[in-house]
């Protein structure tokens, strides 16, 4: 799940105090008191929250800090293969037992039951489950329990799934995917991101030995890399007791393999890639500058919160500049933009991009680079900043009125980001007061300075 642009969302942040007399940017962010969290002796982290939007429903997630990057060459594609196998038999739900057990309660595969595998994580979910049946809630907990540690991985089920994933491998070969496959060796040069695309190697998928997938499973599907997140209309104290009783029984792996962090090497020269595909009709150009992510130790401070607001202001004002260009007669490109955002775990990026008119790649590139350079040299104007400040405050007031209508999945997204990337989880009342205090302190010089920080000659990649 990479994100290219950081947008300030209005469902983040917490504390039940009144307005601050003064903003202390080094103050720690208090965790949302509405979330019950803990860590079991075997290492499993759990997050629980009562929520009645929608009433009488709950969502159950298991979040695993393990994905395709952890594969060796013989396992290329097996993190995703394992995701499929989680629906093909577990200790308490043989065969298609998970799906048949839930579908009789109206909880269907695809709509309510799903999963995804990414380079750094694998996530399973049972969403929008009715809470009027205690036995159904217990069934959902038992499914998460089995997904944690008790996949059966039977030979015949593995062989049956090879064909399913082979077909998925073929359908994923879209023009955009083929372009990405050409770009990744440059975008992620000399890193494991360049060689792990999640769907994997077709030869591996068709021919891997049964023990190969079991080895990957036993090495990385383990309690110290897992979190349980459950949000919905239920008694939290009762749910916590059930989680403790059921999940504490899962054994921790002895002498676990350290979970590595995958770096992307720094470089001084610009890397360049020309990616082509006969089915792609438009020419797009990107210049990506890799930037370090914020250390986890700095994310739990108001200063991190303020930084994200400044970054959001920059992106909004840059976007407004591009919108003005597009509204003029005969704009120099089909579309374009530049801005800051997340890249992959541990990294951010500044991205300049444009889609050119036919045979006008030079015109499009010159136009987008000229506007980017104008911001780098001269910054933004006070009036531009005031507009985005006003827009954010208007949006904040609107979001505050709707804060009690936040859905289960939105809360779980925050829990997932906290577990995987140590993003803070704060209550909206705190967020509301903090934003109103921080926004007036942000100057146009602070926002404009970002352009010089992000437009560097190091760690640049250009794709066309």
Where are these predicted regions, by residue range?
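Scaffold signal of the M16-like zinc-metallopeptidase fold and its non-catalytic homologs
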Residues: 88-90, 115, 119-120, 140-143, ...
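An aromatic/glycine/proline-enriched structural segment found at the starts
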Residues: 23, 190, 227-283, 396-399
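Bacterial N-terminal signal peptides
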Residues: 6-17
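Active-site-adjacent, His/Asp/Glu-enriched structural segments that form or flank metal-binding
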Residues: 54-56, 64-178, 197, 207, ...
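Mature N-terminal segment immediately following signal peptide/propeptide cleavage
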Residues: 28-61
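Conserved small/polar residues in nucleotide/adenosyl-binding loops
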Residues: 464
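Structured mid-domain segments that build the active-site/substrate or prosthetic-cofactor binding neighborhood
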Residues: 285-287, 291-295, 300-382
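His/Glu-based metal-binding/catalytic segments typifying zinc-dependent metallopeptidases
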Residues: 256-321, 353, 409-423
């Amino acid at each position: 799940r990479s994100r290219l642009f950081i947008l300030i969302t209005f469902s983040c942040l917490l504390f039940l105090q009144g307005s601050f007399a003064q903003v202390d940017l080094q103050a720690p962010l208090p965790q949302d008191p509405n979330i019950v969290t803990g860590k079991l002796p075997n290492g499993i982290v759990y997050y629980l929250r009562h929520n009645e939007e929608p009433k009488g429903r709950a969502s159950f997630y298991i979040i695993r800090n393990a994905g395709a990057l952890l594969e060796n060459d013989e396992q290329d594609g097996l993190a995703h293969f394992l995701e499929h196998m989680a629906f093909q038999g577990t200790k308490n739900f043989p065969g298609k037992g998970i799906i048949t057990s839930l579908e009789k309660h109206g909880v269907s595969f695809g709509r309510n039951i799903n999963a995804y595998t990414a380079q750094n994580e694998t996530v399973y979910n049972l969403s929008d489950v009715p809470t009027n049946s205690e036995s159904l809630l217990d069934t959902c907990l038992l499914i998460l329990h089995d997904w944690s540690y008790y996949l059966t991985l039977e030979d015949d089920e593995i062989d049956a799934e090879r064909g399913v994933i082979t077909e998925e491998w073929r359908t994923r070969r879209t023009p955009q995917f083929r372009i990405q496959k050409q770009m990744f060796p440059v975008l992620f040069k000399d890193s494991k991101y360049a060689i792990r695309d999640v769907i994997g190697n077709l030869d591996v998928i068709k021919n891997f030995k049964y023990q190969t997938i079991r080895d990957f499973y036993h090495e990385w599907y383990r309690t110290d890399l897992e979190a349980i997140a459950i949000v919905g209309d239920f008694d939290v104290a009762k749910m916590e007791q059930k989680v403790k009783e059921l999940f504490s029984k899962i054994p921790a792996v002895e002498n676990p393999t350290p979970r590595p962090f995958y770096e992307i090497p720094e470089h001084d020269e610009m890397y360049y890639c020309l990616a082509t595909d006969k089915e792609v009709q438009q020419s797009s150009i990107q210049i990506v500058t890799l930037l370090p992510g914020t250390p986890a130790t700095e994310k739990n401070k108001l200063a991190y919160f303020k930084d994200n607001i400044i970054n959001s202001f920059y992106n909004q004002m840059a976007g407004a500049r591009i919108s003005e260009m597009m509204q003029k007669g005969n704009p120099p490109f089909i579309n374009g933009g530049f801005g800051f955002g997340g890249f992959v775990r541990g990294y951010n990026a500044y991205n300049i991009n444009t889609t050119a008119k036919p045979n006008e790649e030079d015109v499009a590139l010159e136009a987008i680079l000229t506007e980017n350079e104008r911001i780098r040299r001269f910054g933004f104007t006070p009036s531009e900043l005031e507009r985005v400040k006003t827009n954010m405050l208007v949006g904040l007031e609107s979001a505050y009125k709707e804060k009690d209508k936040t859905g289960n999945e939105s809360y779980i997204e925050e829990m997932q980001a906290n577990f995987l990337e140590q993003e803070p989880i704060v209550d909206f009342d705190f967020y509301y007061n903090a934003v109103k205090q921080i926004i007036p302190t942000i100057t146009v010089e602070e926002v404009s300075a970002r352009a010089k920080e992000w437009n560097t000659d190091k760690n640049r990649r250009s794709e066309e």
